Amino acid sequence: YHHSSQFISELYAVDAPNSDLIRYGGYLPSGMLFLLFSLFAIWEKPKSKTKTIGFLGVGFGYGFGTVICSIFNCDAGCNPEFINPSLSQIIHNLMGLLTYLIVPVSIFIITLDVKQNKRFFKYSFLLAALSFIFMILLNLSLQSHYKGLIQRVIEGCILCWIVLYSVYASKSNKAI
């Protein structure tokens, strides 16, 4: 397995070693936790429609998306040419695309609601922009030898934003 040239989903694709352990022991629970993170962030104060919409996007896109992708794994090699894909591959790809379209935009929406916190705004905007730019790059280069690296930049931006939000929310003793 090569992290820079293979999709993350190839770790748990059909016929991959330990795919069920990775799917059900790693990705499924992490998706549920991302969904819970988003729901708890919505319930925190101060409440706003903008924040609620943004966190629904993060929860649906990243949380629910990870759950769906763990249940519907991709075909062996993740079939980037999309030649005779299985139903599981089709669902996996559609959910992955929705995730990478929705989550950067959702982070940006949340960022708009916290302009008063300049540092959080600046880092959130940067992470949202980078994840969106790399999402476009990934979709333009599905055959690239660096597609795994590109995907990991997207994932890293999203995960860094979740940590960033958590740190800022905990420092202020309330959600941002």
Segments the model singles out, each with a brief description of its role:
Residues 66-107:
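Membrane-proximal helix-loop-helix units in multi-pass membrane proteins
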Residues 11-32:
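Interfacial helix-start motif at the membrane-water boundary
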Residues 26-37, 96-109, 157-170:
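Hydrophobic cores of alpha-helical transmembrane segments in multi-pass inner/ER membrane proteins
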Residues 1-18, 78-87, 142-147:
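Membrane-interface interhelical loops and short amphipathic "cap" helices
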